[in-house]
A protein has these predicted regions:
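Conserved N-terminal phosphate-binding loop of PLP-dependent enzymes in the Aspartate aminotransferase
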Residues: 1-330
Length: 330
């Protein structure tokens, strides 16, 4: 138990490498995914992708590498997600002269890409999982944004039909208190020496009580089921909104009570400034949405929300989109 999500992903980085040392691996290669994000501390930023956010780092760990993400708008990736993974990992191993069974220690995956709620095709993740088993490589899911019911399942990785070795959790683990977790088998979690994987305020009584209360609410109040059931209504309404504004709103991504609206015009131009305007107008009208700084707006209503309140919020969103598009035209 730790205090921040970035501590948890760094913990997983250390655990994967310690397991590699135990297994006699030659190098501590961690394979991450392009476009993913894992935190703001040094190791977490190097596992993340955005090069512009890493230009302050003087030394880039040569044993943290990346393979391409299978975006749903990438026709090559969608034609054969399994082969897309194979091509990515084979190209990586060829470029850096790697033997996967001797050099690769771990895969780090964000369960979905946070900026756009973009999930992997299940076949991609399943092929990655099989590859990891064949080569004695640990698989870690970064569940900071997807865990604890957000996607209609307890953990987001459950949509893929695989079993990871490690889970990094936060945010929804305590609903606002500074609690992060790394979950896994005792074989892996017990690798570090006692005291080498601690944090000043980790596992303090207040956040542990909050985490327990959070779990009780999730299960006793049926919030995971509510996320799944309300999520159907949520996404149906968002699809109606997408159809209405199809010249500006290209697609809606997400599952459960999680969605991202991707604003790209018919010519393929990202509409980040339109997202700015919509987010601002929504806020003025009492609805908080997340503008990611890109061409997307994220929605993540409380798991305890009522259907009426959710539909009211979506009505505010729809009207705000309409008004901003109208203002842009004028």
């Amino acid at each position: 138990m730790l205090s921040a999500g970035t501590e948890a992903t760094e913990c997983a980085l250390k655990l994967m490498r310690e397991q590699g040392i135990k297994k006699g691996k030659r190098r501590g290669i961690i394979v991450c995914i392009e476009g993913n994000w894992h935190g703001r501390t040094l190791g977490a930023q190097m596992m993340s992708w955005n090069p512009d956010q890493k230009n302050w780092i003087g030394y880039h760990d040569p044993n943290i590498l990346h393979i391409p993400f299978p975006y749903p708008w990438d026709t090559v990736a969608m034609e054969d997600p399994k082969q897309f993974f194979k091509n990515g990992i084979e190209n990586l191993c060829h470029e850096f002269n790697l033997d996967p069974s001797k050099d690769l220690c771990g895969f780090m995956l964000e369960t979905f890409q946070g900026w756009g709620a973009v999930f992997y095709p299940s076949e991609f993740v399943q092929e990655l999982s099989e590859y990891a088993k064949e080569n004695d490589i640990l698989v870690t899911f970064d569940e900071m944004q997807s865990g604890f019911g957000r996607t209609g399942k307890l953990f987001g990785y459950m949509h893929y039909g695989v079993e990871p070795d490690l889970l990094c959790c936060g945010k929804g683990a305590s609903s606002g208190f500074p609690l992060a977790l790394v979950l896994g088998s005792a074989e892996v979690l017990d690798l570090p020496n006692i005291g080498s994987m601690s944090s000043t305020h980790s596992a303090n009584p207040i956040v542990c009580a909050a985490g327990r209360a959070n779990l009780e609410c999730l299960f006793d109040d049926g919030l995971i089921e509510a996320s799944r059931e309300l999520g159907v209504i949520f996404h149906n309404k968002l699809e109606d909104i997408r159809c209405r504004f199809s010249e500006h709103l290209s697609c809606v991504q997400g599952r459960g009570l999680l969605a991202a609206l991707i604003f790209i015009d018919k010519n393929g131009n990202p509409l980040a400034s339109l997202c700015d305007a919509i987010s601002e107008l929504c806020m003025q009208r009492g609805l908080l949405v997340v503008h990611t700084g890109r061409e997307s707006i994220k929605l993540a209503p409380p798991l305890s929300i009522s259907e009426d309140a959710m539909l009211e919020g979506l009505s505010v969103l729809e009207n705000s989109i309409a008004d901003c598009i109208s203002m842009n035209k004028s």
